[in-house]
A protein has these predicted regions:
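ABC-family P-loop ATPase nucleotide-binding domain
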Residues: 189, 193-279
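ABC transporter nucleotide-binding domains
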Residues: 259-464, 470
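H-loop (His-switch) and adjacent beta-strand-loop-beta switch element
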Residues: 467-479
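Generic alpha-helical segment signature
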Residues: 6, 77, 256-260, 374
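Flexible, active-site-proximal loop/turn residues at the rims of small-molecule/cofactor binding pockets
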Residues: 33, 272, 474
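Acidic-residue sensor for enzyme active/binding pockets
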Residues: 8, 237-239, 244, 358, ...
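Membrane-spanning alpha-helical segments of multipass transporters and channels
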Residues: 1-14, 20-224
Length: 479
């Protein structure tokens, strides 16, 4: 469980799912339910097999107590995995720490914790404190079941029953209480840490989490020049830059403005490290993009293209300024923006064990496609990126070439008819024929949506663009 959760963070698959419209609640319920079902199936076979081969541990003790004990522990184990996963972004480190915990708690439980349990002079309060560790609480429960099974078998009687929970020397009742309380607390803490943690590339904000519990009211469209009282050095701007900025200001003052994307003085500064100065990546970007148009950015690495995309898709927060997608503020309404947004990230975020078709089915369902419309959308997407014929779409993504993965990422960004699409260097790794096919796909797709493209190549398809900007050096400040 731990490695599975951390893997999705490390590969940024969780972020990708969120950007395609999967909310945190359904993600948690689906993941929790998946782990719970697997654990219940495993534990059921474990108990049945132990009973069939005649182990007194299972046969003598009450099955009702065993069911309750294993049920509570399974839920505690899942909550604990979610909690611990919030501290890791590397599968290797998480796996090593996980094995150390399992073997360490097992060895300490068998040699040290058991000694404390059987020592009548050892304070019972300290036993309860030690049982906060899930591994020790599991060992204590198994120890009690084992002791009652042994004594019951020796005396020809039953093992642990519900009546035995009242025995002063029986620690099972305390164990069940401790694990139940810890399960609830661990689940709340795990969800909180998941929301506020920035580990794994997501944006974390403790205050934002508490705001999410309240009803959100996005501020009205208003120029950040008014909000920040920020004066721009106009003499540094070219004529077309100044004109676009004026257009944005006018649109922000118009309550009936219907633009797919409006960027208002969007700015991103990365703090300097090791004594280096701050890095200005995006300086005062103002942009208005209506539906049916495509905006392209061309420039070298470090010009601010990915920084701009990252702010627009919610991976990083703007230092100042803001942007609106169909009137929704990226600072407050990202969850709503995600439902109408498609993203082709700079690096392919895919499951190696799933097929291309399974990827598209999954993301299409997130966009509420069902039935015949779902199947048609998936097949059309595979055909558009040349992954349909020859059964390519039914092969695992791990067997795809780099270009095939890139084409699949493009298909994912367009499935479900998103109203706004961001493609960060979508032509990377594509041969000339595939690149030309990509531009044809974009040309067809832009009719019903606004598209933002970035690229490093001089072969950027300027005829496709209604607006484009060439970045000779960072920072990117306006079109």
């Amino acid at each position: 469980m731990l490695t599975y959760l951390v893997y999705e963070k490390q590969q940024k698959l969780k972020i990708m799912m969120k950007m395609q419209g999967l909310k945190d609640g359904p993600y948690w319920m689906i993941s929790y339910g998946y782990f719970f079902i697997l654990s219940v199936v495993y534990m059921t076979f474990f108990v049945i097999f132990g009973s069939l081969i005649g182990l007194n541990f299972f046969r003598v003790n009450s099955y009702g107590i065993q069911i309750v004990f294993f049920f509570v522990y399974i839920n505690l184990q899942i909550a604990f995995a979610f909690f611990v996963a919030s501290f890791f972004s590397s599968v290797k480190i998480a796996t090593v720490i996980g094995y150390i915990y399992v073997f360490g708690s097992g060895l300490l439980g068998a040699f040290l914790f058991r000694f404390f349990i059987e020592d009548i002079n050892f304070p019972r309060g300290w036993i309860l404190v030690m049982e906060i560790v899930p591994g020790f609480s599991l060992y204590r429960g198994l120890y009690e079941l084992g002791q009652y099974a042994f004594s019951g078998n020796a005396m020809g009687a039953t093992g642990m029953t519900w009546e035995n929970l009242k025995d002063p020397i029986n620690g099972m009742r305390d164990i069940l209480i401790v694990m139940t309380v810890e399960w609830a607390l661990m689940l709340v803490l795990a969800f909180y840490l998941d929301q506020v943690s920035s580990i794994g590339g997501s944006v974390g904000n403790p205050l934002l989490f508490f705001r999410c519990l309240q009803k959100k009211h996005a501020p009205p469209l208003q120029s950040s020049f008014v909000q920040q009282n920020h004066k721009v050095a106009v003499d540094m701007e070219k004529e077309d830059v100044a004109q676009e900025r004026q257009v944005v200001e006018q649109l922000l003052m118009d309550s009936n403005a219907n633009q797919a994307i409006i960027c208002d003085n969007l700015r991103k500064v990365y703090p300097g490290k090791d004594g280096n100065p701050d890095k200005l990546a995006v300086r005062g970007l103002s942009l208005a993009l209506p539906k049916g148009q495509c905006f392209g950015m061309l420039g070298p690495n470090g010009a601010g293209k990915t920084s701009f995309i990252s702010m627009m898709v919610g991976l990083t927060k703007p230092t100042s300024g803001t942007a609106y997608a169909h009137g929704m503020d990226i600072r407050m309404d990202m969850d709503n923006i995600y439902t109408n947004m498609g993203v082709c990230p700079q690096h392919d975020l895919l499951w190696e064990t799933l097929t291309g078709k399974e990827h598209l089915f999954f993301y299409a369902r997130l966009k509420n496609l069902k039935g015949a419309a779902l199947v048609k959308a998936v097949n059309d997407s595979l055909k558009s990126v040349n992954l349909f014929h020859g059964g390519v779409g039914d092969k695992q993504v791990g067997k795809y070439s780099g270009g095939m993965k890139r084409r699949l990422s493009v298909a994912i960004s367009l499935i479900g008819d998103p109203k706004v699409v961001y493609m960060d260097e979508p032509s990377t790794g594509l041969d000339p024929a595939s690149r030309n096919n990509l531009w044809n796909i974009v040309k067809e797709a832009k009719r019903n949506r606004a598209i933002v493209l970035t690229s490093n190549y001089d072969s950027f398809p300027c005829p496709l663009m209604h607006l484009h900007h060439r970045l000779s050096c960072p920072p990117f400040y306006c079109i």
